[in-house]
């Protein structure tokens, strides 16, 4: 056994587990196509100042969690992406995609990196799927993005979900409320935990989503963000809720819900799953119209999106017994050799079957027929195709259905006609 180990906070995903991931990813791709979203892939690292500018210098992500390095002593600092929205927006602006169409609907399934304390569903290298609707952030657009996210969960059969939703108002509304909240919390400085004290100066809104019961008790008496919203923001939020009602999407209004990234405004939402325990957030998102301006676009760009943690999603699906319903996919045919003398003939058979789009496996380790049959059953092959002296001479092969154990004789052409997909 090697003394090398995976880096702390990372994990290997072997083929038996990858099959479940591929199934979930296929559902995501399918739902994205229902809503006419198109996949985008961006570099795994970006210049550090992109995240400092977009996520916010006062956030925990920028302050504590980014993997940053400087490949050239005289060059710019580079960071492994801790989230996708900033990179997608950078790509959109750099590629001048707005000149092609006013609205772009993009989605991704991508690996991200953060220096977090590893725990179940929270790794230092992790995967998210998400969507960004750029060029529109109307109530209908917000509802469309939420509907797409919930559609994925529905097709996967996930239960025990709670969609929490709130409005953060405009940037100006948030600034007024931030000042009022800080003024309310200052007298409680001696009762706040270290994390909340740090947020009190940098971004007091983050204190609202503290999981510390003592802090939650203090926050329960805080002024409400709703009291600082302009009427237009309230009206817009109610319109979003109306669209969700029309689609039959259940939600809970939560005035304490805030998002951890500074670029959010107006509608914010989060999905919780009861099977994830204390850390029950599955994903979330919201509007971020001001991000394009922050990145130098010169003007706001309407935008709304979400992100869902894939590891957390897989844990929730497993705990609800939904991954066991995914049928294991083995090869269509396992070619079983009676004698190694017929290996050349068997390899040619494999080639013909594969050319006909029939997935085919063959023993390359020189095992006995009994061991080959055990392997065929272990990898859940659908059929065994037997190759021996009689089969080679006649061109007719024994084809055994490994589920029913029935066996018939078939020529290669008949096997291809029966099992071929091409």
Curated annotation (Swiss-Prot):
User: EC number(s)?
Assistant: 6.1.1.21
Question: What GO MF annotations does this protein's record show?
Answer: ATP binding; histidine-tRNA ligase activity
CDD domains according to UniProt: HisRS-like_core, HisRS_anticodon
**Cellular component terms, GO, for this chain's entry?**
cytoplasm
Q: What InterPro entries is this protein classified in?
A: aa-tRNA-synth_II, aa-tRNA-synth_II/BPL/LPL, Anticodon-bd, Anticodon-bd_dom_sf, His-tRNA-ligase, HisRS-like_core, HisRS/HisZ, HisRS_anticodon
List, in alphabetical order, the GO biological process terms annotated in this UniProt record: histidyl-tRNA aminoacylation
Q: What class of enzyme is it?
A: ligase
Annotated keywords: Aminoacyl-tRNA synthetase, ATP-binding, Cytoplasm, Ligase, Nucleotide-binding, Protein biosynthesis
Q: Its catalytic activity?
A: tRNA(His) + L-histidine + ATP = L-histidyl-tRNA(His) + AMP + diphosphate + H(+)
**Annotated compartments:** Cytoplasm
**Family annotation (SUPFAM superfamilies):** Class II aaRS ABD-related, Class II aaRS and biotin synthetases
* Chief localization: cytoplasm
What family classification does the UniProt entry report for this protein?
Belongs to the class-II aminoacyl-tRNA synthetase family.
Quaternary structure, per UniProt, is:
Homodimer.
According to UniProt, the name of this protein is Histidine--tRNA ligase
* Taxonomic source organism: Prosthecochloris aestuarii (strain DSM 271 / SK 413)
- By which gene is this protein encoded? hisS
